[in-house]
Design a protein with these regions (language model features):
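N-terminal basic, low-complexity leaders that serve as flexible interaction/assembly modules and, when applicable
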Residues: 1-38
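Alpha/beta enzyme core
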Residues: 28, 33, 41-166
Length: 166
């Protein structure tokens, strides 16, 4: 309840979604949380990410991992969540990672493309959405502006969890 009191401008639906994350898993109710982020296969490539552990190629593996480990939530790109959201509906709070990038270029000034939407997060029953910003990037102003626009669009439904990538 104390944590929820810090979000006085949010509506009951948004607070309910935040509560789902805070009360789930082994740390549920402690005010602490652990989220399984599975977007590295997109950003760093499947060879580096999944080849060392072949079962990880199956998106459902990550749902099971998060559940067996008693984690607070599972965050992933749209395709990963679509692959298992129906089978695991209500079992685990989901976080849709709205933006992603790949490693096919040697871009020293990274920027992520928006690959998910608020509508998709609602359709999948997500408890929150995630977004990555690279603070040192020359594109940081555009990333912050997109983050602000998505935050405004998401506010009636979700907390937007921002990740500052390095």
């Amino acid at each position: 309840k104390e944590i929820l009191s810090w979000y006085g401008s949010d509506n009951p639906g948004t607070l309910t979604n935040l509560t789902r994350i805070l009360n789930h898993g082994k740390l549920g109710g402690s005010g602490k949380l652990v989220i399984l982020p599975v977007d590295q296969g997109v950003e760093h490539g499947p060879g580096r990410t999944y080849v060392p552990n072949p079962p990880t190629f199956d998106p459902r593996y990550h749902f099971e991992l998060a559940l067996e480990a008693g984690l607070s939530a599972y965050a992933a790109p749209l395709g990963f969540l679509e692959a298992g959201a129906r089978d695991y509906a209500g079992d685990l709070p989901l976080i849709l990672k709205l933006n992603n990038r790949e490693n096919l270029s040697s871009d020293k000034d990274p920027v992520q493309a928006v690959t998910g939407s608020i509508e998709a997060a609602l359709r999948l029953g997500c408890a929150a959405i995630g977004y990555t910003v690279y603070p040192g990037s020359l594109q940081r102003v555009q990333m912050y502006e997109k983050l602000q626009a998505l935050t405004e669009e998401a506010k009636p439904y979700f907390k937007l969890l921002a990740d500052c990538g390095i």
